[in-house]
Amino acid sequence: MSAESKKTTKFTYYPGCSSQGSARHLDESLRAIAPEIGLELEELDDWNCCGASVGHIGGGQLPNLALTGRNLANAQGQGKQDVVTGCAACYLNTHAGNEKIKTDVNAKQKVNEALAAGDLAYDGDLKVRHMCEVIVNEVGVERIKSRVTNPLTGLKVAGYVGCQTVRPFAETQGGGEYDTYNDPKFLDDFSAACGATPVPFNVKTNCCGGSVSVMSPDKTLHLIKTILEEAKAAGADVISTPCPLCQTNVEMYQDTINKKFGTDFQIPVVFYSQLMAVAFGLDKDKGAALNRNTIESDKLEGMAKKRA
């Protein structure tokens, strides 16, 4: 193994609320694959909700910024390494809040006044990154390939990015820091590096409905139905996504959609990190966390390793 392939990069890891419940399989598989691809994840101490949902309920912009500021102040206390998260909503909200604090002197002052109540302060010097971008720019597909011991040969994967993961880059970097917004390729590249076959998927950045599923479920069902129809038409064995809410919505609403529209969808929806964990030969449950998926993929389960 070359010196480059042994290189390890350290990050402050922000798991986010979904990692404690609906997206435990994302968190567990990310932690499992990180050392395999040279990433050291130091969990953020005493982290709180990013505010993607509750932070917008009332009180204006400050409560939301203060939630972001508190996390980043704690991260600053752990060192100057970049902050990384695997959750699209956490990333979008924390990235946006961080940029606001960095560029708006008045906002930064108000945030630090709020943080002072907890003896905290944030300088605005940290960078917030999404795990997918880190894998693209710090790891690369060649390193992923070098760790594959159990190639996912014959597994057809529809890469569903969702609408949030690449959005801040599209807004602030003139089209994307690591990929384009309209036609991102990174999930396809990840799947191919693992030995799987990416399939054409024209709705890869369509919205799944997000939290609208709570307020207006009928609208969400139509959005998800389109995603499932495209995946089925492409012959996908599984749908791969980086987003906890996308994974939950597209997986959990299939039964409801089948009953409402007379369809027969039963398409497994997994996180890209679960595919990597299987390809790296990690334990199917302790590494890939396949036991946490509601819809099982017989094909992927058959490829996964079970270790004592």
Language-model segment annotations:
Residues M1-A308:
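Iron-sulfur cluster-binding electron-transfer modules in prokaryotic oxidoreductases
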